[in-house]
């Protein structure tokens, strides 16, 4: 069974983008390449259990085992040593990527309190979009009673688009609720 969002991309988004930007080939139409979820756990320096819980939550959200990220260099002000585990990240591609994006757009983002749309200023100039989520509780897989601490996470949507405008139209076509 093909994913609902992937079908929407193939049947609706590709023709709309081709018409708007006058692409000569279907392969020139921008597409979502990967989604990277990153959870920085600063308090993992003092308590390693926090990192394990954060990684478990990230695995629940993404459906994939996260990679533990380590500090690249020592920073005395943060009591940080090089090589200490300080976060977790997951890179989603293919079917899981579309499933996550569909869940994010249709279920998770509407659960955010006082939600008026995601900001349009978060594009990086090369067609990639970054979104910060303040609490992991907006995801349906996270059980409220099992959460020991509210943690945020970064979501980076990497597209093949060359400009921010193309990327914005792609994500809008996929249902991303941008603020007016």
UniProtKB/Swiss-Prot annotation:
InterPro entries: Ribosomal_uL5, Ribosomal_uL5_bac-type, Ribosomal_uL5_C, Ribosomal_uL5_CS, Ribosomal_uL5_dom_sf, Ribosomal_uL5_N. Keywords: Ribonucleoprotein, Ribosomal protein, RNA-binding, rRNA-binding, tRNA-binding. Disulfide bonds: none annotated. SUPFAM superfamilies: RL5-like. GO terms for biological process: translation. One of its GO terms (cellular component) is ribonucleoprotein complex. The keyword tRNA-binding applies. GO terms for molecular function: rRNA binding; structural constituent of ribosome; tRNA binding. This is one of the proteins that bind and probably mediate the attachment of the 5S RNA into the large ribosomal subunit, where it forms part of the central protuberance. In the 70S ribosome it contacts protein S13 of the 30S subunit (bridge B1b), connecting the 2 subunits; this bridge is implicated in subunit movement. Contacts the P site tRNA; the 5S rRNA and some of its associated proteins might help stabilize positioning of ribosome-bound tRNAs. Part of the 50S ribosomal subunit; part of the 5S rRNA/L5/L18/L25 subcomplex. Contacts the 5S rRNA and the P site tRNA. Forms a bridge to the 30S subunit in the 70S ribosome. NCBIfam families: PRK00010.1. This is Large ribosomal subunit protein uL5.
């Amino acid at each position: 069974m093909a994913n609902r969002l992937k079908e929407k991309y193939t049947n609706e988004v590709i023709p709309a983008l081709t018409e708007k930007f006058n692409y000569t080939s279907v392969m020139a139409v921008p597409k979502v390449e990967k989604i990277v979820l990153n959870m920085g756990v600063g308090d993992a320096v003092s308590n390693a259990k926090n990192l394990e819980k954060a990684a478990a939550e990230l695995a629940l959200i993404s459906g994939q085992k996260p990679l533990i990220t380590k500090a690249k260099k020592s920073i005395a002000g943060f009591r940080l040593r090089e090589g200490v585990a300080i976060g977790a990240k997951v890179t989603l591609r293919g079917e899981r990527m579309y499933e996550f994006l569909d869940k994010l757009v249709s279920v998770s983002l509407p659960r955010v309190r006082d939600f008026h749309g995601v900001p349009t200023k978060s594009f990086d100039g090369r067609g990639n979009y970054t979104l910060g989520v303040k609490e992991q509780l907006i995801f349906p897989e996270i059980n409220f009673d099992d959460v020991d601490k509210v943690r945020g996470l970064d979501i980076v949507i990497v597209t093949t688009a060359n400009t921010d405008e193309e990327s914005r139209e792609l994500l809008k076509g996929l249902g991303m609720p941008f603020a007016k």
